[in-house]
Curated annotation (Swiss-Prot):
Pfam families in the record: Erythro_esteras (PF05139)
Other remarks on this protein: Erythromycin esterase type I and type II share no significant homology except for the region from 279 to 309.
GO molecular function: carboxylic ester hydrolase activity
Gene3D superfamilies the record matches: Biosynthetic Protein domain, EreA-like (biosynthetic domain), EreA-like, domain 2
Gene that this sequence comes from: ereB
The protein, known as: Erythromycin esterase type II
GO biological process: response to antibiotic
Purpose of the protein: This enzyme confers resistance to erythromycin through inactivation by hydrolyzing the lactone ring of the antibiotic.
Organism: Escherichia coli
Length: 419
């Protein structure tokens, strides 16, 4: 049997609904998801309006019907705590715009956060929001550093000079994305770069050296949270320098996996919470949630978060990618004189490449469909071997990289990018 014939028989069709409409189309996913503890929902490009709409409906279904209790997002770990407090009732409804002003976050995401805030007002089981990423999209040390600095000021004044020194250097790199920080890394001297890296490592080691005292005084949860903030600064530091290497043409294989290691650790850190059995929805780019290495023309770009979560928790992790057949997508290019350190082109999609999952699913005559890969027949022929990444196609063994794919017929870039 060919892949196209199998898809015709096995696909689950759905409609892209208004955020308040029902999610009946997705109820066949109950058996597929089962007791899976961590389910990741992807996107083949950032800033796509329809992907946010689809994930909003899926989020409601996962929470209301399947009992998921945590929404984990490709968003700064420290900044995420502010939004978590907000969805639990702090502040006013309109503050959400202020929390999202540091990036191209569309209205559809605000709608999701407002829904979570309203849901938590009456829910017995409150929903947690978890930012899993390095600080401020990889552009600034400060969201994490300010918290760790405050901790040292109270808990370890003797070592405060270490983080003071790091802070004085780090505040010169206060941007909104990894590419923006990398493009402006020249603002630090080579000596400052080395000193910052060294002092960040000393901050972490000092926390670990003093762990018994901190745990006794503040508790294990507080200590491990502060340590995770410190790790976020270290991974961000590495990630900025790795991106600088890629932009200059000298990047090492696998280097961009630093961010993915931290995101995977953030999810696993949350799963260790002894207070409840968490079921987590993770939302991030397809390239972060997939379970196999990211390769560009044979070059190993990244060992992704999804691969690490699969290795850590096995079949308790499920990766569901999202892509589109036609319309427009966001193509991103590092560029120094832009708002967030990259140019976003509103790229017109052409006919999908032969061998792509987009071409194969649309070739079956189905649109807006979900295809599940876990029980795919071993003798199935013509399985697609590539998927779109932003405006290009990337080789992947689809049935190993993802447990399933949602494909929508037409995508568009959110208006927020061009405001």
């Amino acid at each position: 049997m060919r892949f196209e014939e199998w898809v015709k028989d096995k696909h689950i069709p759905f409609k892209l609904n208004h955020p308040d409409d029902n999610y009946d189309d997705f109820k066949p996913l109950r058996k597929i998801i089962g007791d899976t503890r961590v389910v990741a929902l992807g996107e083949n490009s950032h800033f796509i309006k329809e992907f946010f709409l689809l994930r909003h409906t899926l989020l409601r279904f996962f929470i209301e019907d399947l009992g998921f209790t945590t929404f984990a997002f490709e968003f700064g770990f420290a900044e995420g705590q502010i939004i978590n407090n907000w969805i639990h009732g702090q502040g006013t409804d309109d503050e959400i715009g202020r929390f999202l002003k540091h990036f191209y976050y569309p209205e559809e995401l605000k709608t999701t956060f407002l829904w979570l805030r309203e849901y938590n007002k009456a829910a017995k089981e409150k929903i947690t929001f978890l930012g899993i990423d390095i600080p401020r999209n990889g552009g600034s040390y400060l969201p994490n550093m300010e918290i760790v600095h405050d901790f040292f000021r109270t808990a370890d004044k003797e070592a405060l000079h270490i983080i003071d020194d790091a802070f004085n250097i780090a505040k010169k790199i206060d941007y909104f994305s990894t590419s923006q920080a990398a493009l402006n890394l020249h603002e630090l001297t080579d000596s400052e770069k080395c000193r910052l890296t060294s002092q960040l490592a000393r901050v972490k080691v000092r926390l670990e050296a003093m762990a018994p005292i901190h745990i006794e005084k503040y508790g294990i949860d507080k200590y491990e949270t502060i340590l995770h903030y410190a790790n976020g600064m270290i991974y961000l530091d590495y990630n900025i320098q790795a991106m600088s290497g890629f932009i200059s043409g000298g990047g090492m294989q696998g280097d961009m996996g630093a961010k993915d290691k931290y995101m995977a650790d953030s999810v696993l850190w949350h799963l260790k919470n002894p207070q409840s059995e968490q079921k987590v929805i993770v939302v991030a780019h397809n390239a972060h949630i997939q379970k196999t290495p990211i390769l560009y023309d044979g070059f190993l770009s990244c060992l992704p978060m999804g691969q690490r979560l699969k290795n850590a928790i096995g079949d308790d992790y499920m990766s569901l990618g999202i892509t589109s057949y036609s319309g427009h997508t966001a193509a991103l290019y590092p560029e120094v004189d832009t708002k967030y350190g990259f140019r976003v082109d509103n790229f017109q999609l052409q006919e999908p490449n032969e061998g792509s999952v987009e071409k194969a699913i649309s070739g079956c005559g189905v649109t807006n469909s979900f295809v599940f890969f876990r029980n795919i027949p071993e003798d199935l022929q013509s399985i697609p071997n590539m998927i779109r990444f932003d405006s290009i196609y990337m080789k992947a063994e689809l049935e190993k990289a993802f447990d399933g794919i949602f494909q929508i017929e037409k995508s568009s870039v959110s208006e927020v990018v061009y405001e």
